[in-house]
């Protein structure tokens, strides 16, 4: 049996990307952002098509993502942050709630959101992961933005089946 398969598309030309970056654990978050923006540029996304917004911490990321999603100006969003375990339960709370909120934005608004909020046991782990995770977030955002467009076109193709010429004139 032969099946259709979508090939990943990492061409960022013309894509508009919104980035929300936490300022808490700032050196790590800046490293994430630098790697992410560098990779977006390598993939063909221009600086004028990227908006970087900073927020105090990981718990504030979902609201900023929501506002960007509501604007309708972006093809994909990226969340950047670092939650590093301390000696209290706060780590679990921040990790779980920020992750849940980020996922909810993607589903509620139908927009790809690449989640690069690191959750690590210590500073060393965060520093070791920040560059590759920043790059990965850029690739994920571009790939998913292109996939979303391709899948939306599938939906449009199904709507066209069986329509007459009158329907085509209405869309023109």
Curated annotation (Swiss-Prot):
Positions of the UniProt region annotated as Disordered: 150-172
Record carries keyword Chloroplast: no
Enzyme class name: transferase
InterPro entries: LS, LS/RS, LS/RS_sf
Positions contributing to 5-amino-6-(D-ribitylamino)uracil binding: 24, 58-60, 82-84, 115
One Pfam entry name: DMRL_synthase
Associated pathway: Cofactor biosynthesis; riboflavin biosynthesis; riboflavin from 2-hydroxy-3-oxobutyl phosphate and 5-amino-6-(D-ribitylamino)uracil: step 1/2
GO cellular component: cytosol; riboflavin synthase complex
GO terms (BP aspect): riboflavin biosynthetic process
Composition-biased stretches (Acidic residues): 154-172
Reactions catalysed: (2S)-2-hydroxy-3-oxobutyl phosphate + 5-amino-6-(D-ribitylamino)uracil = 6,7-dimethyl-8-(1-D-ribityl)lumazine + phosphate + 2 H2O + H(+)
Keywords, alphabetical: Riboflavin biosynthesis, Transferase
Active site: 90
Binding site for (2S)-2-hydroxy-3-oxobutyl phosphate: 87-88, 129
Enzyme Commission number(s): 2.5.1.78
GO terms of molecular function: 6,7-dimethyl-8-ribityllumazine synthase activity
Superkingdom field: Bacteria
Recorded family membership: Belongs to the DMRL synthase family.
Function per UniProt: Catalyzes the formation of 6,7-dimethyl-8-ribityllumazine by condensation of 5-amino-6-(D-ribitylamino)uracil with 3,4-dihydroxy-2-butanone 4-phosphate. This is the penultimate step in the biosynthesis of riboflavin.
HAMAP family (UniProt xref): Lumazine_synth
Name of the protein: 6,7-dimethyl-8-ribityllumazine synthase
Source organism of the structure: Paraburkholderia phymatum (strain DSM 17167 / CIP 108236 / LMG 21445 / STM815) (Burkholderia phymatum)
């Amino acid at each position: 049996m032969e099946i259709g398969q979508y090939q990943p598309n990492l061409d960022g030309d013309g894509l508009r990307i919104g980035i929300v970056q936490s300022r808490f654990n700032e050196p790590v978050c800046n490293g994430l952002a630098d790697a992410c923006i560098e990779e977006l540029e390598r993939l063909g996304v221009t600086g004028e098509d990227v908006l970087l917004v900073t927020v105090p911490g990981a718990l504030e990321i979902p609201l900023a993502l929501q506002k960007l999603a509501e604007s309708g100006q972006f093809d994909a969003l990226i969340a950047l942050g670092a939650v590093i375990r301390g000696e209290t339960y706060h780590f679990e709370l921040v990790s779980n709630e920020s992750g849940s909120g980020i996922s909810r934005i993607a589903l509620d608004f139908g927009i790809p959101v690449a989640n690069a909020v690191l959750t690590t046991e210590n500073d060393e782990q965060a520093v070791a992961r920040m560059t590759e995770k920043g790059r990965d977030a850029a690739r994920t955002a571009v790939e998913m933005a292109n996939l979303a467009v391709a899948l939306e076109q599938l939906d449009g193709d199904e709507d066209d089946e069986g329509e007459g010429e009158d329907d085509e004139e209405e869309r023109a």
